[in-house]
Amino acid sequence: VKIKLTVNGLQVEAHYHDDEIENVHKPLLQQLAKIHAANPQRRTIVFLCAPPGTGKSTLTTFWEYLCAQDPCLPEIQTLPMDGFHHYNSWLDAHNLRAYKGAPETFDVDKLAQNLRQIREGEGFWPQYDRQKHDPVEEAIRVTAPMVIVEGNWLLRDDERWRALAEFCDYSLFIRAPANALRMRLVGRKLAGGLSQADAEAFYERTDGPNVRRVLEDSLSADLMLEMTLEGAYRTA
């Protein structure tokens, strides 16, 4: 299946094989529907944790599309974790702006407050503005009965991040070969206009360490997916 999706405000053409849709994505969404049906009066919160470069945003947008096509599946809404970056003013004061994206650059307490709020009723969610390079508060109205919170550090094995587990009804993790992620992430920077040398330097300074930390320091999830070298997904 070839499909045009709007991901983070940009048009993306995504490709998914029919057998992958039938054997991986639809069964996963049916499982999430069962979890929601067991407690339908409360919003279901799913964590999708994965290293950079695994296509989280495109994948969850595709899941939104699949749910909209199937009346047996609940409406889902993707909530990216990027809006919980500390503001640049805070990062500058703590000499962390060069490491933006690392777990230390996120406001975990604020994330916990928002998760508590949306679990109990309708609420709002911040969004990361890629032009301003800062969060915009209350940019997303949370209305769906099921939300997928996606980010790199949601299952991080660290005291402050582990505390988020109380808000999670089901967790997903995507593993991928580190060399495949390197190719994808360097390619992303090249497409954004960086030179080969600058793109590789950015990977070594920021994306590469984050990939290693996610793959090495994350807790087990309820369901593990694997991304292949070709960018397809399968159940681990």
Task: List each language-model region with its residue ranges.
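The Walker A (P-loop) glycine that initiates the GxxxxGKT/S ATP-binding motif of P-loop NTPases
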Residues: 50
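Small-molecule kinase domains that catalyze NTP-dependent phosphoryl transfer to phosphate-bearing small molecules
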Residues: 137, 159-162, 190-236
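Conserved lysine of the Walker
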Residues: 56
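Charged, amphipathic alpha-helical linker segments immediately N-terminal to NTP-binding catalytic cores
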Residues: 1-26
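Conserved nucleotide-sensing/catalytic segment adjacent to the nucleotide-binding pocket
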Residues: 77-80, 86-132
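ATP-dependent NMP and nucleoside kinases share a basic, alpha-helical "lid"
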Residues: 132-188
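Walker A (P-loop) phosphate-binding loop of P-loop NTPases
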Residues: 53
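Hydrophobic positions on the alpha1 helix immediately C-terminal to the Walker A/P-loop
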Residues: 59
